[in-house]
Amino acid sequence: MAVTVVNHPLVKHKLGILRQHDVPVSEFRAISNEICRLLTYEATKDLETEKVTIQGWAGPVEVDQIRGKKITVVPILRAGLGMLDGLLDMIPGAKVSVVGMFRNEETLEPVKYYVKLAKNIEERMAIIIDPMLATGGTLNATIDLLKEAGCPQIKGLFLVAAPEGIKKVVDRHPDVDIYVAAVDERLNEHGYILPGLGDAGDKIFGTK
């Protein structure tokens, strides 16, 4: 597994805005998608391209096109939906799979309540999106079900992550690459990231 922190001035600046306790809902949504676009750029650098000839304005011209890689984006409900538009802006042809999970606040273990995967998942690279990688339990459970369905390659994009969660995922799924805007200090006793973003789902959907 490779853990890539996208250490770019634009990412740092935008993430700093998201950390403000009183950031408006509309701004939180917009910036979450902006950061997701930048993470997507990094996560897709290894896509292979091929030369094809198209008809340009002045005649035939040779261009590069992504070669046959089928992609599905997997938002983890509900907060992951807040990054979906950003990724689809970059890869509009990606199919959308949906995984619904919530964390039991007493045990901190993930509870699955909904799964709808794209067809031919065994032929697709899956890109999981979720604002926060905290304990790692939800991500591990999502990776488990994607692998059980036959998905051959999996990546994850996150706004912030905790070291504890990264380690948990690395130990269980060393073949999955993670891209994150920042690795924060730690988890608190309730399993929340510090300094973190607060409840990203509430901030995205205006239910805080």
Curated annotation (Swiss-Prot):
| Keywords attached to this entry | Allosteric enzyme, Glycosyltransferase, GTP-binding, Magnesium, Nucleotide-binding, Transferase
Quote the record's activity regulation.
Allosterically activated by GTP.
A GO BP term here is: UMP salvage
**UniProt binding sites for 5-phospho-alpha-D-ribose 1-diphosphate:** R78, R103, D130, P131, M132, L133, A134, T135, G136, G137, T138, D199
Keyword match Nucleotide-binding: yes
**Molecular functions per Gene Ontology:** GTP binding; magnesium ion binding; uracil phosphoribosyltransferase activity
What Gene3D superfamilies is this protein classified in? Answer: 3.40.50.2020
What Enzyme Commission number(s) apply to this enzyme? 2.4.2.9
Which Pfam family is an annotated match for this chain, by its short name? UPRTase
PANTHER family given for it? Answer: ADENINE PHOSPHORIBOSYLTRANSFERASE, URACIL PHOSPHORIBOSYLTRANSFERASE, CHLOROPLASTIC
Similarity comment text for this entry: Belongs to the UPRTase family.
The name on file for this protein is Uracil phosphoribosyltransferase
What's the source species for this entry? Answer: Nitratidesulfovibrio vulgaris (strain DSM 19637 / Miyazaki F) (Desulfovibrio vulgaris)
Q: Which gene encodes it?
A: upp
